[in-house]
């Protein structure tokens, strides 16, 4: 068997056809292709000389012999005809079309054993030719799937009795001899459109010498066909004849396009298969011709089976048609291309013929392209031909990502059918992403491709890459993957690969010109449009709602000149290299950077220049202030032009440089002035509204002592006379040199640092970089300024107290016990001076403001705080688990007296007391044993065990160190309060589920799981809302990378989205439930905490009394008693007395609570992900994966999971008594937490599938899931301390993460928010008052109402500035006058705030303004929330109204006693609305830390409504009590 091949010169393969347009004589030149080889030699010898001139004029086949018009050859039909498909990637004019052509001049033997190439030419000689046309007014070939147009009507006189049809792969298409001439004429007419067709030539095809191929390199063109034909005929003679069946059967050959790697020059690869024939049109005046794919390379038998690779770009689809040609006895085996006589008439007829099949094929290719994008890659050994890649201006080649695989469909010519349905073939190409297992039936391939692109864009937004999704929607793809990798060099390899897979998909879809609808948020109550990018090199322009680059890479050639004009004016004549595709990405975007002032958009230096005209590019001349938080910034543009508008602009570099520099100077000058104004403070806190901040000098890594001496460097601490070594401190700050200036300045912490208590004096050197018993929000362990403050403060403390202090023990002191009081020579225990009470653990100093914690012994009616203005003494604990920051009071004397060196001889005193050393050593050993079995084997307590740790025996009640709260008070509080206040609400509606006045205080659980100082800033619950948003996106990226790497392709979908709250058509009503079966979100909306109070009390009961019960959670309880406990919980809600209950009953009830949740604790969407992590991910990668999965959980689920895991870790700590290891606990609790093997409930999520009943052997899937759940829960219990920390990789995100902390501002910084240098905080407060009354005057226009179960009005308003937080407003009517309500808000917060722990006035600024600090409790073991606010009130407002305004402020005298909350805005407006009634309007926008934006959207508004209800109820309860008292 033979294949027709014609040799081409090297120049024809690598150059475009640049010939001039042909004259009218050229249009009458035709190409004649012989199709039978027997009499080929004579005809060639006859006509070779006669048709030389004609051959030179031929455009379609430049080197062919046109005189070889073979009409009457009785020879045998040729066995195989080679087919090649080509396309034109460079559209330089309006008259460019797509054509499929093939030449059949040269015959080269191919093995008959290859069944994939068995195509014979029948008597009817049916040949398929497809031609496309693209007119200037209408783009017919626009993209994959964009050609869904009506098919032209096929004229009967053109088709005659023969019609295009479809046959099976092995069917025989029989055409009678009588229709042969008609078919030939019709085909000839359809081929006369070549002057409208242009195709690019094959470029740089490697020459492969395969078996039985003839090397015809040196043969003259005139003798080429003659020599090839003679050799081919000689080789065909010994071929064994085929049997009748084989000769009468046509084997369908499918040429499939597969993804194969591109070369480093970005040229797509093409491999040509054998077995079909496409006739060459006679002439192609306006373009290049498509030659045979085998002209330059021969293929062996195994090579014939490998499908080819074709690059489709700019909407032009490579069409390769599978031709099933029936084989009969040879009769007249020729097809003749006749010369044109009436070209214009024939052209019109040919258009109809060609467009019919073209549209049919393109419609089918829409489906094939999608299939090709979701299948595996081709074999590595596939030989390929290189094709020229010439994208348009908006496209660029990308290494490994700029090829589109197109599946070839099967087309058969039939004489008895007119069907136009084209079956789709199986996809075999790889898109770079793992596909889903099953394809959706009924969806076209185009729609699938668009869905895949849409999912890729959604994934990019969900994982912190919204800038690339925007670029794709702006038609600025393809982009260079290498630059993206360089831009995100802080990511690990797996994350980069996951990102590149999506970008590769979008690159291919961009080449196919697939369009997706612009991104739209899901609903009006969604905050999806909140900008968040992992990379710090991109910034979001809020005014234009677009992303722009903050830094430009040096990837553009400075030598390239800029040519003004539209990108449509001209196109590059040569394909750009892979490195030059980001020019559109950065130049067409509004690039904003002070570093890119003189950068110009250009092609890469290694990209070949255009031959005709330089490529028009727009330089990056628009410098936009990228700080999105600068209010009223004059340096930012109000609106930016679109990329297309921007591309047509022309700029002058000199003018641009001058403008940008002036803007940069003004911006830097403003920032510097703001920094200098706050520099006189003890800490240089940069306002959160600023962008770039220049930090102070930082000691760089590698700066040795010799270098310091040469530079004359002197230790700052030495200048102050400090006696503590600082090299250790400097060593901690080395990593700070890798931080950017922005992050280093933003991470500077408060000067209100704490110091160890006197008991921990011996650990001063090793713990100089620690803080005792405190949560330091925003603490940066890499910051050097923190430790300098510690050093300076310690120096002041030592200087403030004499060295020869003598302490006196009371006369009635009993040896072996702690003294009741200690005094020294300068303090008298009976005077007004300070004293230490060892029994109560307090120190009383004279004349200091009080800051005391609400003890559990205080009854609810004894919540009266001492007024800070009238308190004469400060009660401060000196136990070593006290937050050292509490020791800083509002005046400086007490802080100086109570630092670590107040009692320097305390250790000696304790040592010399009779029997004290022995008892202390015994306590130390005993506590060490308890510490080994405590909840945290790797305890991160800020105060590790030491011989000096206090262990009290008071009133025969055993008080362990873990039962001491942060003030040292005993926390063995009674299980139930001595008096439970009676419910005073209405008893209907939402009041049934409203929390009582009692709120659980579980300080021992909080203190025992308090993180260490080094890990405080890494705790999730200390992160701001912007950091949480960024952390969630990074976690999704990390989880996607790990799952795609290790899990099978059918175990996860293409798209990973951040879990959202599921929207059901019918929302279940939980009004009749209070505990069991109530979602965690509803609990948060009702009480502010995700776990009901009664469930928390059950956990505390088990932890305090039942840890020694053998088989806890394993042994079953009594069902009747469990049911009674359930009913007790449903009725009492908050106060359930578990005293005397069986530990196993309570444990079983706790398991039932988690089992009865509407969805698993891990949520329906992520439960399977948790199981997959422990099924497929390697053990060393599981911790990263599980941390990422936890970050994707909703906030309430994550908080409950943390509480439960910490509680279970305490259970396993007592393993010697209860014999419950983490694995044993996991076996008992995993089915309840993951909802394994449970039937679908009525109110469960649609994802929960009904399990099959276990009739015999359990399902293998269930076994695998149970095993994974057990292993996973055991692992999470053991590693619970590490699961809820920020990944270390986030510290490598440079300023993109640290700059999102958004700390409160100082008073000076608040005054400068209005860009007035002379303004102070009073101007800021006045602006706040004016803004409040502006809202009132406008009647709160623009607020959106929000439904709530509380008896209050609730609405919200979106705020474009600052973090992604809404401004909430709740309104209620209160039975009190405005003055009383204002007093209740200012002085009586404990009457309505059930979570209040502490309150204190830090500083009084004027009669109506003060700095106020208060602490609120959180669900254990989560830390308390610390508020430091600047609050001011107004009483002289019109119509008797009052107002209270609060804003967080950074104050150096406010101790950090919890997670510092950032109150962005808090307003109370009280207006009289009747006799004895007032209308209370509460507006709030607060960052509580540790919550996602979704939590604030779904839950925070309900908390605001609940707050005003509690304020109203405080007056209602007071009135009711007053009436009860009068009635008695």
UniProtKB/Swiss-Prot annotation:
Biased composition (Low complexity): 374-384, 591-605, 734-760
Span list, region Focal adhesion-targeting (FAT): 710-884
Domain SAM: 448-515
SUPFAM superfamilies (UniProt xref): Bet v1-like, GTPase activation domain, GAP, SAM/Pointed domain
Effect caused by changing residue 877 to A: Abolishes interaction with TNS4 and results in diffuse cytoplasmic localization
Tissue: Highest level of expression in the spleen, with rather lower levels in prostate, testis, ovary, small intestine and colon, but none in the thymus.
Domain Rho-GAP intervals: 1078-1284
Positions of the UniProt region annotated as Disordered: 72-94, 288-310, 372-436, 558-617, 732-764, 829-876, 928-990
Span of domain START: 1314-1521
Domain of life: Eukaryota
InterPro entries: Rho_GTPase_activation_prot, RhoGAP_dom, SAM, SAM/pointed_sf, START-like_dom_sf, START_lipid-bd_dom
Membrane topology: Peripheral membrane protein
GO CC annotations on file: caveola; cortical actin cytoskeleton; cytoplasm; cytosol; endoplasmic reticulum; focal adhesion; intracellular membrane-bounded organelle; membrane raft
Polar residues composition-biased segments: 396-436, 936-948, 961-972
Domain notes: The SAM domain mediates interaction with EF1A1, and functions as an autoinhibitory regulator of RhoGAP Activity. The polybasic cluster is required for activation and mediates binding to phosphatidylinositol-4,5-bisphosphate (PI(4,5)P(2)) containing membranes.
Oligomeric and partner information: Interacts with EF1A1, facilitates EF1A1 distribution to the membrane periphery and ruffles upon growth factor stimulation and suppresses cell migration. Interacts with tensin TNS1 (via N-terminus); the interaction is decreased by phosphorylation of TNS1. Interacts with TNS3 and PTEN; in resting cells, interacts with TNS3 (via C2 tensin-type domain) but, following growth factor stimulation, TNS3 and PTEN are phosphorylated which leads to weakened interaction with TNS3 and enhanced interaction with PTEN.
PANTHER family cross-referenced by the UniProt entry: RHO GTPASE-ACTIVATING PROTEIN 7, RHO-TYPE GTPASE ACTIVATING PROTEIN
Function of the molecule: Functions as a GTPase-activating protein for the small GTPases RHOA, RHOB, RHOC and CDC42, terminating their downstream signaling. This induces morphological changes and detachment through cytoskeletal reorganization, playing a critical role in biological processes such as cell migration and proliferation. Also functions in vivo as an activator of the phospholipase PLCD1. Active DLC1 increases cell migration velocity but reduces directionality.
Protein name as catalogued: Rho GTPase-activating protein 7
Native source organism of the sequence: Homo sapiens
